[in-house]
Amino acid sequence: MGGKTGAIAAFLLVIVLFVAAVLLWSERGQMAGKNVNATEECSDSAVIVIDPGHGGFDGGASASDGTAEKDINLQISMQLKKVMEEYPVKVIMTRQEDVALNPSEGNIRSMKRQDLQQRRRIIDEVQPDLAVSIHLNNYKADASVYGAQVFYPKGEQKRTDMERCEQTSKNFAEAVQKSLEINISDGRERTAMEKNDILIFENPTCPMILVECGFLSNQNELNKLKMAEYQRKLAYAIWEGIDEILCLEKGEKMKIIDSANR
């Protein structure tokens, strides 16, 4: 009788341990899904650089109707700034108007490089929690291609600090990509990708991402990209992804700084 009772007790103990393990696994899965493999702790405030791509003499890509990438980049960036103003975020804009950053005389290629170097200089000086560059894509070889995609830097050097920046950049990029997929709902599934052929990504000193918000070469997407409401939707989706990592709550507004005119 004692042996039988002991066997029953052992069996019940196994059942209890199994249920506990299942519950623990489920809880961990929910937590992992919340922050897209992020290792960062939630913050009380943040510093973010918003970098509207191109500007001034550099129009970036252009649509068939003449729409310049630089203009939509700025419009989306300003919408993103408005969203961030509702949170404890100190925002530094690389530009808030149609200007290039400190171009000097020279050929176009040289001037573009100087512009990018100045943007990167601002980011390096500020050392934000995140720098996000806003751009648009263009693929005239296939006008059916559409959808937003997020990129993050891949460094060639193996420094511990750089690896940490790259991992955090990847976390932000994956969170923003997922948010775009959920909030834009355009039927296009994309994966955040690493990229090492962008000057502004070279040897990162802080977390950085670049968001290609859509394709100017796709007529349907172009029509949406020119609409203020869609730009607001994109900005909201980008911020939702960023805040998935930062976990900020709406609160006291912080100052917006325009680095191009400071």
Predicted regions and their residues:
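Periplasmic OmpA-like peptidoglycan-binding domain that tethers envelope proteins to the cell wall
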Residues: A63-D71, N220-E221
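Short glycine-rich His-centered loop
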Residues: S45-G66
